[in-house]
A protein has these predicted regions:
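Feature captures the catalytic ectodomains and active-site-proximal regions of enzymes
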Residues: 1-508
Length: 508
């Protein structure tokens, strides 16, 4: 039931990090008297917004998708790479039902286990440490025949560094006493995502039929490719002689890529009975195929090691369940973030959740119009506040992030100066209703726009982000928080219980 009639707003200044150093810092350089006054007048703290604190690998910069997921969920949302690595560290990986199923299938059929995926530590599609964990698991489970089908990277890592990874793999197999490299293919062939089936066919034929280029070992396969002037990404599918590692009836395959888009086509070629991408020279019967994550909800004849998790009781869902009303508002560039990502990857709005999309300006790059659509967003949100319709308003200003990405400091300063005109109007409007605002950011950007050598930085920063409580009677905020603490803080400020699923801590 509705007990709380004063409006609460979460205002996200996208890309507005906290940086005490003024060098290369467009936020510090901007003329922003109103924002300066707000930051001085109201109690605040800073929040961690990158790396392990938002479910990313240590030291990895945050981003808008991850930031809004964590804010809306009220818990750390582990990204696939981190989640799998964590499972390896805590040992649950080795008990994984789908992975165990593959091992059991191989033992029952006295057959072979094939591991396929991108051989690098790029961390975008896969990670070599996950492959090593699978080899360790196979050894522990008593698997005798194990083959690795190496897809070479050269995109998320330097263009010619495959030998390093092949050598690491061979060392690991030697140390474990299990495994052979069966094939080596550039990701251009094995990881196509644009239905260029002629490429996928070459990778399939190497793995299933031992057809293609031939080489005595993995390193030779790479060196032969280099002599043909092929970088890692483009290495022609190559079969390792005497490995006898083709995929046969009754075998099991584990695809260890966790990113779906480039794992779908090669997977479908092996598992789909109705496959029509190319004429398969050999169809594999009684194949147990495991995907590391969900590559495609419609993919037939596969099991998933790490199925997608649905999140219960995100902030939006919980507010709706309390019979309260909410508004999401942003310009085009950040609309998906305050809706889809904020709702835990769910497209449909919650009950009593209204949405306002303000079109972003049609310019080639936002340094040409650094105010973007901030004034229009402000106008719309002021109208919405005046209706007294909403208990919770989630607002995103895109400027510090999108103009920060252009690398043009003067434009980024103007972007912040536009916010300086908008934010105080909204503060006044909310305070006139005796409401409250939590002002924050999802990650930094405009706070670091030059590196120490004076080069332009267009990426996000690793800096903390602000959290202020703006109210007629503001509350002190506890230090040491991270983005997942925002939702529990909002609920406490609204005098609502915090659901058990939210493992973030209220900072009031």
């Amino acid at each position: 039931m509705k007990e709380f009639n004063r409006p609460t707003m979460l205002m996200i200044l996208d890309g507005y990090g906290i940086n005490q150093d003024t060098y290369g810092n467009a936020i510090a350089a901007a003329d922003k008297p109103h924002l300066d006054e707000i930051f001085t007048k109201y109690p605040g703290t800073t929040l961690k917004a990158c790396g392990l604190d938002v479910g990313l690998p240590e030291g990895q910069m945050g981003n808008s998708e991850v930031g809004h997921l964590n804010i809306g969920a009220g818990r750390i949302v582990y990204q696939d790479l981190t989640m799998i690595t964590k499972a390896i560290e805590d040992g649950s990986f080795f008990e994984n039902e789908a992975l165990q199923k593959a091992m059991a299938h191989v033992k029952e059929n006295h057959s072979a286990l094939h591991l396929l995926g991108l051989l690098s530590d790029g961390g975008v599609h896969s990670h070599i440490s996950h492959l090593f964990a699978l080899i360790d698991m196979a050894k522990k489970e008593g698997i005798e025949n194990l083959y690795v089908h190496c897809f070479l990277d050269g995109r998320d890592v330097p263009p010619r560094c495959a030998e390093k990874y092949i050598s690491q793999l061979e060392d690991h197999m030697k140390k474990t006493g299990l495994g052979k490299i069966a094939t080596v293919s550039g990701r251009y062939y094995a990881m196509d995502r644009d239905k260029r089936w002629d490429r996928v066919e070459k990778a399939y034929n190497a793995m299933a039929c031992s057809e293609g280029e031939q080489a005595p070992d993995g390193a030779s396969a790479v060196n032969q490719a280099y002599s043909r002037d092929e970088n890692d990404e483009f290495v022609l599918p190559t079969v390792i002689e005497n490995a006898n590692g083709s995929v046969n009836n009754g075998d099991a395959m584990i695809m260890f890529n966790f990113r779906p888009d480039r794992a779908r086509e090669i997977t479908r070629a092996f598992v789909d009975e109705d496959f029509d991408g190319f004429e398969r020279k050999k169809e594999i019967k009684d194949l147990c195929y495991i995907c590391m994550t969900q590559y495609d909800a419609e993919m037939p004849n596969v099991s998933l090691a790490f199925p997608p998790e649905t999140m219960a009781n995100t902030l939006g869902e919980y507010i709706a369940d309390q019979g309260l009303t909410q508004l999401r508002i942003a310009e085009t560039e950040k609309y998906a973030h305050v809706t889809f990502f904020f709702n835990g990857g769910v497209e449909a709005p919650n009950r009593n959740e209204d949405r306002i999309l303000v079109p972003s300006p049609k310019v080639a790059t936002y340094d040409m119009q650094p105010e973007m659509s901030a004034y229009e967003v402000t106008e719309k949100v002021l109208e919405a506040i005046e209706t007294d319709k909403y208990d919770l308003i989630i607002l995103n200003f895109a400027n510090a992030d999108m103009v920060g990405h252009t690398g043009v400091i003067e434009a980024a300063k103007k972007a912040i100066e536009a916010l300086d005109k908008c934010v105080p109007q909204i503060v006044d409007s909310i305070l006139a209703k005796d409401g409250q605002i939590l002002l924050t950011a999802d990650h930094g950007n405009a706070d670091v726009m030059l590196d120490k050598d004076g080069n332009t930085v267009t990426a996000h920063s690793l800096n903390d982000v602000p959290l202020l409580h703006i109210a007629n009677e503001p509350k002190q905020l506890k230090d040491g928080g991270r983005l997942c603490d925002i939702a529990p803080t909002i609920l406490k400020l609204m005098h609502l219980d915090i659901p058990a699923e939210m493992t973030g801590k209220p900072l009031v």
